[in-house]
């Protein structure tokens, strides 16, 4: 009984003491902007309107049309078609998946249909429904509304 209690306390306390052991993170020079996900129940999902990263009023949310990452005029915004420094998308397995940008001209943009990260035929594109990164059934895809490990968004700190 005593050993079960110790295991229970350790299972609860370890994630609190060492959250980085269980969470994916950005580089040392990047700012974490949440998880690019269709899952509205993940606390750090961009689809969670009540969370910090999906809230249209949060300053660092890509959903805030007046914020740095959601404004149609900011160079670091996901919705600026002429943006030059949109957030990076990093998959749970560490694969770089391009930039979450509305620019159809940026070679790293997921909106460039001829680019490596925007093509619906590329294996590293979130727009390819047959790849592990774009499938609506993959646990690491942003397009799966039940995904548990969707990719993270990282902004470049300057």
Tell where the protein language model's regions lie, with residue ranges.
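C-terminal segment of classical bacterial N-terminal signal peptides
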Residues: 12-20
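Repetitive, compositionally biased segments used for assembly/scaffolding
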Residues: 20-158
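Bacterial N-terminal signal peptides that target proteins for export
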Residues: 1-7
